[in-house]
Amino acid sequence: LLRHCPPMQVPPSVPGTRARTAHYTSGVSTQHARKSSTSHVEGARSPRIGVIGGGQLARMMIPAAIELDLDLHVLATTPEESAARVSTHVMLGRHDDPEAVTAFARSVDVVTFDHEHVPTGLLHALEHEGVVVRPGPNALVYAQDKLAMRARLSELGHPCPRWWRVETEADLEAALHESGGDLILKTARGGYDGHGVMRVEALEDAREWLERGQPLLAEERVPFVRELSAQVARRPGGEIATYPV
């Protein structure tokens, strides 16, 4: 059964959106979601794009989706998340809840993400069912795990700072010695925007992290002037577009 929360009007100040009413459903059925995206023209409808996560990135997709005549659906944890406040199609559920994610995925044509923290095992299971996942779990793992990312970039020959896998005090001591005693230490998973990152000049600086027993990524400190992000898009057919910095 579907559980509907009170309708919510989109604030008119949100760029690129029209005044609309959002209907929230729990992640246990998809009948309402399927019917709600049907076009007024019999048999025709806009493609349904499902975004797992209701944060700022999902919210920024909404105006672009409207311009492209795409029907954007959002799986949000709560109605208070950024994208959930302005989307017309919101299903409530956690990104790591198999039942919620599966129900959501079955209600859309393609699944994508607001963040990288969806379990890849769950995504592999969805792909096995025939769900289209973009990017797929084999690519998403490199956004989830910094150690996997560094290993893959190094394997491909891309320039990287010197880096070390750290699991023990001995690992960190060796990395400190090789780097000259000045490292940036990062959690392999879960860090973002300054969280899960610390500067380490001695073993004691990182003892608490080492005691957690989780793999860490140590990198040499790199002097830099600025940080740039390059956006690249790829269609399933192989066409690639790069956007100017």
What are these regions (language model features)?
Residues 3, 17-18, 157, 237:
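Generic detection of intrinsically disordered/low-complexity segments and helix-coil linkers/edges
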Residues 1-2, 6, 23-151, 155, ...:
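ATP-binding N-terminal substructure of ATP-dependent carboxylate-amine bond-forming enzymes
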Residues 10-11, 26-27, 33, 37, ...:
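Residue-level detector of intrinsically disordered/flexible regions characterized by low predicted structural confidence
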